[in-house]
């Protein structure tokens, strides 16, 4: 019975297996009724199915790999463009760099108090170029750092040099623009006598003046050889007889007497071209006369006192008037 059942089952399998193989797979050789052919057909069917599944897997992997490669190849130009062109990320980094630079350039300004400024100005007036030790001392006095003191002195020296240059320019330009409105421009017409041609004044002098004979002589250009001050002294130096004349006539005008005496002694000599001075020592003569009067009174008082006692009276000198006493004394 067991053998019959096995044969029946094999026959059923053999009868069914060709149809299944024809339906499922193509290109399989016909199956014989023998058991060996049936087993080989089944084995070939399984192998072909496994191969088909593996081929499908490989194709899917290839398609996946191809799509990934396409994706990578499509994304690679974007990466190149991002490196070459400007993107928002690079703009942000540039803005950050600019902000950092601005923050570095911005420095905190030092606000000095009035006491600190007063101390710094006094130190600058004493020494414009302090050394390190002096700057440290000033920093200790003013409660500042040495760097702040050094920067302050540097700026103060620059300000001082600028002010000096401006003042020098104002002096060169004629007391600056605010003084130019007060000063009138030089006009040759108004000051023709003081023009550069004043050296040729002998050519402008009329002929009668040049024709006169002067005791001190003239050079080729007609200019006196003697200094005007010395010539003035020569004109007004009195001769030896003037002293006796003035003592005899004290009330006579000295200037007129000098001119008259010089004209009498030298009638051929031309008169002095300079005007005769008046009486420049009138105030001194008044002082001398008052002093002489006081001395005279003192002498009279001393003689009166001496005469009241029994002392021998000294020889009385000849009393002179105040005017004669003042004239006799050299001025």
Curated annotation (Swiss-Prot):
It is found in: Nucleus. PANTHER family: PITUITARY HOMEOBOX HOMOLOG PTX1. Keywords: Developmental protein, DNA-binding, Homeobox, Nucleus. The keyword Nucleus applies. Belongs to the paired homeobox family. Bicoid subfamily. Coiled coil: none annotated. SMART domains: HOX (SM00389). It comes from Branchiostoma belcheri (Amphioxus). Residues 31-44, 53-66, 83-92 have a biased composition (Polar residues). GO terms for cellular component: nucleus. Residues 105-164 bind DNA. One of its GO terms (biological process) is anatomical structure morphogenesis. Involved in left-right asymmetry in the developing embryo. Residues 25-44, 53-116 are annotated as: Disordered. Residues 101-110 have a biased composition (Basic residues). One of its GO terms (molecular function) is RNA polymerase II cis-regulatory region sequence-specific DNA binding. This is Pituitary homeobox x. A motif (Nuclear localization signal) lies at residues 295-299. A motif (OAR) lies at residues 289-302.
